Amino acid sequence: MKPLRLSSLDPVRMPEWRWAPFLSHAINALIPLKPEPYPVAPEFLQREGKTGSKSQPIKVTTCTWACRTKKFRQVRAACVEAGSSASVLNFVINPYHTFDLPFFGADLVTLPSGHLLALDLQPAITSDERHTKQVWERLMPIFEQWRVRLPEGGPIPEEAKPYFSPGFLWTRLHLGSEGNQLIDEVIMPAFRDYLNLYLDLVEMAEEVSPQRAFKLLEGQKRYLSYRGKKDPARAMLARFHGHQWTESYIHNVLFDL
């Protein structure tokens, strides 16, 4: 049977996937940067599965959209649609370590218990003011603008704090019309603002010295190693697609540095 997607740049088509407008906006914003396909093995470009009961199975589709550019080692979107069980967009921009840039991260998740939504420009080296100062000075006004309109998502685990900025926008919303309205009126414009700021920082970024690049690379490796070990989607993906596929996906695609 012919694969549904042949390239990491092929469109993600999943009917009723609620996060499609977010991915579409991000892809359009990247067009001026002339994205090229990022190497993703065929078994991770699109995978079908089932969840639910034998009498009432629910179709699961997991897709990966990915690219690279002059300054981005990897841009990737992990996209999951499983009907009432889950709808997910995990969108991360990994810059080359030769540029003094944070990661861009958006985690948009709908589960039967509600929406879990997070946006951030995540530092590679939290304790390094040279790395964080210019980012946080511009990020915090955007964060303050949108956080007052959202309920707080809850505390961040102590071990995770080094991997987030003070502008980590994190909320939990109830399912239903009120949550949908907040997604449309707050989360979507906040997503655009965070991404616009990030792309402005990218445009200004210049290559750093080899010594600085090595330090940034070490920070990126720590971040991606932590994310790979603590990925909260691991249990869900394993339930949908099996343990072996999930571990390979996490370590060879999502956090592959």
Swiss-Prot record:
GO MF term set: cobalt ion binding; phycoerythrobilin:ferredoxin oxidoreductase activity
Keyword Cell wall biogenesis/degradation among UniProt keywords: no
Organism: Prochlorococcus marinus (strain MIT 9303)
Top enzyme category: oxidoreductase
HAMAP family for the chain: PebB
Function: Catalyzes the two-electron reduction of the C2 and C3(1) diene system of 15,16-dihydrobiliverdin.
Reaction(s) the record says it catalyses: (3Z)-phycoerythrobilin + oxidized 2[4Fe-4S]-[ferredoxin] = 15,16-dihydrobiliverdin + reduced 2[4Fe-4S]-[ferredoxin] + 2 H(+)
UniProt protein name: Phycoerythrobilin:ferredoxin oxidoreductase
Gene that encodes the chain: pebB
GO biological process, one term: phytochromobilin biosynthetic process
Pfam families for this protein: Fe_bilin_red
EC numbers: 1.3.7.3
Stored InterPro entries: Ferredoxin-dep_bilin_Rdtase, Phycoerythrobilin_Fdx_Rdtase
Keywords for this protein: Oxidoreductase
Transmembrane helix in keyword set: no
Family per record: Belongs to the HY2 family.
Domain of life, per lineage: Bacteria
